[in-house]
A protein has these predicted regions:
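Flexible, glycine/charged-enriched surface loops at secondary-structure junctions
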Residues: 77, 120-123, 212-219
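Catalytic core of soluble alpha/beta enzymes
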Residues: 164, 169-282
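Catalytic domains of carbohydrate-active enzymes, especially glycoside hydrolases
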Residues: 153-162
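Conserved, mostly hydrophobic/aromatic
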Residues: 3, 41, 65, 104, ...
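Structured beta-strand/loop patches that form or line metal/cofactor-binding pockets in enzymes
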Residues: 1-40, 44-45, 49-50
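Active-site mouth loops of central-metabolism enzymes
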Residues: 131-146, 189-195, 238
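N-terminal small/glycine-rich loop or linker at the start of catalytic domains
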Residues: 40, 91, 115-140, 174-184, ...
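Metal- or metallocofactor-binding catalytic centers and their adjacent structured scaffolds
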Residues: 37-115
Length: 282
């Protein structure tokens, strides 16, 4: 079996208005489907992260990566991935290049599953557990009252874990008062603070028993600063959404920069690299 073509399909999915209203609603969510076609008629489907620059990712996939892998055996996933990494070394180690590689790599696993007539999780060694809890990831709201209302809405739908996107103590207090002590709350702040500001905020938030505090420091790769935050608070620190490489995650672990690793499978190179990062956490 040989790869005959790589196709990148940009999507723009309209976002519905939400109640309560949020500055994050409206517009479209951009994403890219990646199709790996073969000479035997089997096609693999993957997904590439594309927030903010979808056409740039499409260009990397179709103009840079496709010429490298057309003609290769799609079932030799490690080989194809190695060719992509080496062929994009100068510009593809992070960001858009890694997003593009991720989409193709995920499509290769989908293709392998179709050839073997097995779900990908079985190809990876089987399920460790039959179910996982899901959390509701809330939008960012303009008032504590809106936060409380959104929390009550999702708890009524059955969620027992909620992730907030606020950057103030009052909103977290309102959320905790709205849901009571038995619902887990996480807080994703999207990298707003210096390490010193983050330490002060983390300590101020401790009474509300956050399950984790996510990405509290700018820039997100300031792992030394994040390590200071992690050492100064009882709240677990989550990070890694903006990291693109196994080696970056190794540095997070080495510096003890946080407690919860959050690799995005469409950002770090796909399923194979994701598994290696999970092994680091173990």
């Amino acid at each position: 079996m040989k790869i005959t073509a790589i196709e990148a399909v940009p999507l723009a999915i309209p976002l519905k208005p939400m109640t309560p209203p949020s500055p994050w609603t409206g517009g479209t969510r951009k994403q890219i489907y990646v199709l790996v076609h073969t000479d035997e008629g089997v096609t693999g489907l993957g997904e590439a992260f594309a927030y903010g620059a979808p056409l740039a990712v499409v260009s990397v996939i179709e103009e840079s990566l496709a010429p490298l892998v057309v003609g290769l055996d799609p079932l030799a996933i490690e080989k194809v991935v190695d060719v992509m990494h080496r062929g994009t070394m100068i510009y593809g180690r992070r960001g858009l290049g890694m997003f593009a590689i991720s989409g193709i790599e995920i499509a290769l696993w989908d293709l392998l599953g179709k050839v073997r007539n097995a779900p990908v999780y079985e190809l990876l060694g089987g399920a460790l557990r039959p179910r996982l809890p899901a959390y509701a990831s809330l939008l960012r709201y303009e008032t504590p009252e809106a936060v409380a209302g959104a929390c009550r809405h999702f708890v009524a739908q059955g969620f027992r874990m909620l992730k907030l996107h606020q950057t103030d103590v009052a909103s977290v207090r309102a959320a905790r008062e709205a849901v009571g002590p038995d619902v887990e709350l996480m807080l994703d702040t999207n990298c707003p603070w210096t390490p010193y500001e983050a330490i002060a905020m983390a300590r101020a938030l401790e009474p509300y028993r956050l399950f984790w505090l996510e990405e509290p420091v700018w820039p997100p790769e300031d792992y030394a600063g994040l390590a200071r935050v992690a050492a100064a608070t009882e709240t677990p620190i989550a990070l890694g959404e903006n990291e693109s490489t196994l080696y970056g995650f190794n540095e997070i672990v080495r510096q003890r920069a946080g407690d919860v690793l959050q690799p995005s499978i469409t950002k770090v190179g796909g399923i194979s690299e994701f598994k290696k990062i999970a092994a680091l956490a173990q």
